[in-house]
């Protein structure tokens, strides 16, 4: 059979497996790749066994060491990138650093145990970092003889999801056995196909970066005599064209409006700049001293400057090059957003006296300058230029 060409016409979706240790996340990942390879053979659908997924290579993301397995597969209608983090700490780091941006996730719960502490923590983290769509896979149903027990476990999971503002009563719950499917039991293979049909239909197609409102973090500013001020940087999302009205947001109290009079890339004029492009933007009516690194150029009204927010953070361990000692309330490090450091103070949650290296915690932050942030913006926490933590904005306060 001739090799298929990679089909870019299929929508691409990022998903992952989450849930308590030993509930079968990695076995399910292996089962999905294996069953799809049997049922929908293609150059993309290659079976991956448990060992190869479990032996995930170490990666460094913003100074943090994370073990993550990335696998890809496709259904009849979509192409998926699937992330599986072997250890609980890896999972937490993945979520908080934004290394794994998931459009949706499969929550794996062993029917033999029901929801466990990490089940709860992963649901909470999904809520905090903006994973909006969860599908439940109740694993190991072949080990439970009592139908009523399965119903109880399902109710318990649904209640837990509702507690964290997921639609617990309505979201899909699929009961199966990843191991049996992996071993080739057709009944359980059918359930894996049903799970993938559910993922196809329940997790909406993500909005493409180019369809989102413009956001361009300013890296450099210079003036061209007779033409005006140029701001350069990499377009984070959206598009920019000549004659677009934009806003310059952050650092300064006032948000300034301006009009784009030119878009250049590698010294060539462009009709439009797209997400991912490194561009220079010529701005009319902006003085050289009215814009600086650390601000963002954005579609008017799409993002606002803030000084106070709640964040979900992971503090590097000593082995990762982080602090050697804990920090306490009112700790004042630098927060690095996109292209700049801003000092801020940290307020710890009630009842938390200190944070140890290697911990993850929810904090309240107050910055000394306003910065363009929104829910889901990631940041690093730094001391004297070295990274000591990593976080994501979970809620805007002011």
Curated annotation (Swiss-Prot):
It holds the Pfam family GTP_EFTU. Residues 10-207 form the tr-type G domain. Mg(2+) binds at residue 26. Residues 177-179 are annotated as: G5. Belongs to the TRAFAC class translation factor GTPase superfamily. Classic translation factor GTPase family. EF-Tu/EF-1A subfamily. Its EC number is 3.6.5.3. It is found in: Cytoplasm. The lineage of its organism: Bacteria, Bacillati, Bacillota, Bacilli, Lactobacillales. GTP hydrolase that promotes the GTP-dependent binding of aminoacyl-tRNA to the A-site of ribosomes during protein biosynthesis. InterPro entries: EF-Tu_GTP-bd, EF-Tu_GTPase, EFTu-like_2, EFTU_2, G_TR_CS, P-loop_NTPase, Small_GTP-bd, T_Tr_GTP-bd_dom. Residues 19-26 are annotated as: G1. This is Elongation factor Tu. Residues 139-142 are annotated as: G4. It is an enzyme of class 3 (hydrolase). It catalyses: GTP + H2O = GDP + phosphate + H(+). GTP binds at residues 19-26, 84-88, 139-142. Residues 84-87 are annotated as: G3.
């Amino acid at each position: 059979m001739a090799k298929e060409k990679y089909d870019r016409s299929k929508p691409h979706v990022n998903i992952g497996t989450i849930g308590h240790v030993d509930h079968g996340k990695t076995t399910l990942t292996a089962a999905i790749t294996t069953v799809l390879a049997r049922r929908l053979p293609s150059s993309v659908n290659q079976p991956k066994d448990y060992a190869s997924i479990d032996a995930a290579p170490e990666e460094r993301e913003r100074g943090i060491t994370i073990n993550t397995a990335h696998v890809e597969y496709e259904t009849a209608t979509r192409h998926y990138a699937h992330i599986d983090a072997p250890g609980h700490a890896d999972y937490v780091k993945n979520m908080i650093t934004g290394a794994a941006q998931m459009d949706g996730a499969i929550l794996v719960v062993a029917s033999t145990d029901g929801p466990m502490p990490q089940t709860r923590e992963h649901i909470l983290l999904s809520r905090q970092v903006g994973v909006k769509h969860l599908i439940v896979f109740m694993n190991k149903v072949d080990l439970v003889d009592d139908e009523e027990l399965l119903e109880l476990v399902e109710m318990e999971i649904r209640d837990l999801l509702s507690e964290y503002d997921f639609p617990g009563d309505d979201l899909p719950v699929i009961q199966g056995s990843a191991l049996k499917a992996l071993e080739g039991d057709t009944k359980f293979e059918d359930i894996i196909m049903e799970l993938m049909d559910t993922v196809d239909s329940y997790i909406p197609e993500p909005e493409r970066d180019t369809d989102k409102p413009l956001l361009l973090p300013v890296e450099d500013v210079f003036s061209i005599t007779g033409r005006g001020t140029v701001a350069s940087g990499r377009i984070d999302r959206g598009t920019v064209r000549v004659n677009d009205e934009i806003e310059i947001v952050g650092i300064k109290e006032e948000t300034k409006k301006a009009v784009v009079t030119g878009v250049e890339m590698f010294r060539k004029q462009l009709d439009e700049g797209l997400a991912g492009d490194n561009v220079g933007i010529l701005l009319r009516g902006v003085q050289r001293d009215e814009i600086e690194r650390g601000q963002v150029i954005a579609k008017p009204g799409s993002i606002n400057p803030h000084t106070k927010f709640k964040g979900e953070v992971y503090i590097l361990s000593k082995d990762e090059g982080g602090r050697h000692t804990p920090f306490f309330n009112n700790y004042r490090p630098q927060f690095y957003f996109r292209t700049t450091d801003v000092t801020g103070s940290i307020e710890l949650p009630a009842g938390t006296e200190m944070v140890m290296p290697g911990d993850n915690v929810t904090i309240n932050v107050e910055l000394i300058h306003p910065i363009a942030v929104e829910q889901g913006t990631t940041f690093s926490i730094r001391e004297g230029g070295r990274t000591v933590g990593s976080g994501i904005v979970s809620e805007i306060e002011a």
